[in-house]
Amino acid sequence: MRCLTTPVLLRALAQAARAGPPGGRSLHSSAVAATYKYVNMQDPEMDMKSVTDRAARTLLWTELFRGLGMTLSYLFREPATINYPFEKGPLSPRFRGEHALRRYPSGEERCIACKLCEAICPAQAITIEAEPRADGSRRTTRYDIDMTKCIYCGFCQEACPVDAIVEGPNFEFSTETHEELLYNKEKLLNNGDKWEAEITANIQADYLYR
């Protein structure tokens, strides 16, 4: 059996391509190809008006100037964006931001160490330790939130029976180290003291739906 060299093989393939498919019938001339419809193919209109319009668009760059005119029109409109961080948009009363522990007007901590927030947290970001006081009430000795685990679902705020743990209006609390996002009780109480007015207003605005 003779082995075909590369030049011979290439010549054979070229002759087969010129001869067409077996049977001598091309796909483009078959009955199936005759039924094809070119949906997006449009023949250009050749009447005088259409030819003149196409020539004007090509020679005078009408579409280019139309686009430039639209761009210039937006320069004199009211901007749709704000200059953050110097300007800030409104926040919903239901906005879930940085966590905080609240106090009563007397200064007493609201948290009763029921641990419902710790139990309901799907990310297991909350750690609570508590002990009874001399008057028989329970108060937390440790209240930690790992903000790197928190998913800001708001379940802790919804589960709290005394509105102690809340998610405040602050969303600007980026840090440079991981340790700064490990909140302890003191940090959470300071947040509550700082944002108490806004938190109270948000709770009152949303009381019908709580």
Curated annotation (Swiss-Prot):
Superkingdom of origin: Eukaryota
Source lineage: Eukaryota, Metazoa, Chordata, Craniata, Vertebrata
Gene3D superfamilies found in the cross-reference section: 3.30.70.3270
PANTHER family given in the database record: NADH DEHYDROGENASE [UBIQUINONE] IRON-SULFUR PROTEIN 8, MITOCHONDRIAL, NADH DEHYDROGENASE UBIQUINONE IRON-SULFUR PROTEIN 8, MITOCHONDRIAL
Uppermost EC category: translocase
Span of domain 4Fe-4S ferredoxin-type: 102-131, 141-170
Amino acids binding [4Fe-4S] cluster 2: C121, C150, C153, C156
Organism: Gorilla gorilla gorilla (Western lowland gorilla)
Alphabetical UniProt keywords: 4Fe-4S, Electron transport, Iron, Iron-sulfur, Membrane, Metal-binding, Mitochondrion, Mitochondrion inner membrane, NAD, Oxidoreductase, Repeat, Respiratory chain, Transit peptide, Translocase, Transport, Ubiquinone
EC number of the protein: 7.1.1.2
NCBIfam families given in the database record: NuoI, PRK05888.1-4, PRK05888.1-5
GO process terms (BP): mitochondrial electron transport, NADH to ubiquinone; mitochondrial respiratory chain complex I assembly
Subunit relationships: Core subunit of respiratory chain NADH dehydrogenase (Complex I) which is composed of 45 different subunits. This is a component of the iron-sulfur (IP) fragment of the enzyme. Interacts with RAB5IF.
Keyword Transcription listed: no
Name of the featured protein: NADH dehydrogenase [ubiquinone] iron-sulfur protein 8, mitochondrial
Task performed by this protein: Core subunit of the mitochondrial membrane respiratory chain NADH dehydrogenase (Complex I) which catalyzes electron transfer from NADH through the respiratory chain, using ubiquinone as an electron acceptor. Essential for the catalytic activity and assembly of complex I.
